[in-house]
Amino acid sequence: MIIKDVEFIKSATKPSEYTEPLFLEVAFAGRSNVGKSSLINTLINRKSLVKTSSKPGCTQLINFFLLNGNLSLVDLPGYGYAKVSKKIRAQWGPMIERYLTVRETLRAIVLLIDMRREPQREELDLINWFTAHAIPYRIVLTKADKLSKTKQQKNISAIAKGLGMEQDRLIAFSSKTRLGRDRLWQELDTMLNP
């Protein structure tokens, strides 16, 4: 995809604060510090439009970005970070589920999993939830540059087995080397233009 224009639109916590549902949307979900913001910056060829942090739990709101005036990218809060207050953690689950449930322009979800880690219960629950609600999704394995090629293949195989799916359904990704960027755009294009 040729990126001509990208802009941050707004942050939200509830449906009344969401952007008007005028454009197709792709949402990005995953654990805290899995690299959602870095992945979005890599996809849109920007270094810092989406705020990144080495501290988990930085994204605490649903952030909407408009790409080329016709596609909305949505950065969801990360889940699973214990050092965020219990009150905030308790709000994230319902906030994300509400967005995923009511957003009629949502066309695809990109679920990010750190390639160095085994999938956790939350990832399996999300995949089951996406499937039950007939929401198309892709799984991206982030931080591939942190592993050797041999270790990447070993981990891809283990993660695919843990998720009960074929390896070719997983996209290895690195924001540092841009590995997987073109493939992810191809997959998104297929989902957005069936």
Curated annotation (Swiss-Prot):
Binding site for GTP: 30-37, 57-61, 75-78, 142-145, 173-175
Cofactor(s) needed: Mg(2+)
Origin: domain of life: Bacteria
Family: Belongs to the TRAFAC class TrmE-Era-EngA-EngB-Septin-like GTPase superfamily. EngB GTPase family.
Protein's job: Necessary for normal cell division and for the maintenance of normal septation.
Listed NCBIfam families: GTPase_YsxC, small_GTP
Name the UniProt record assigns to this protein: Probable GTP-binding protein EngB
UniProt organism field: Desulforapulum autotrophicum (strain ATCC 43914 / DSM 3382 / VKM B-1955 / HRM2) (Desulfobacterium autotrophicum)
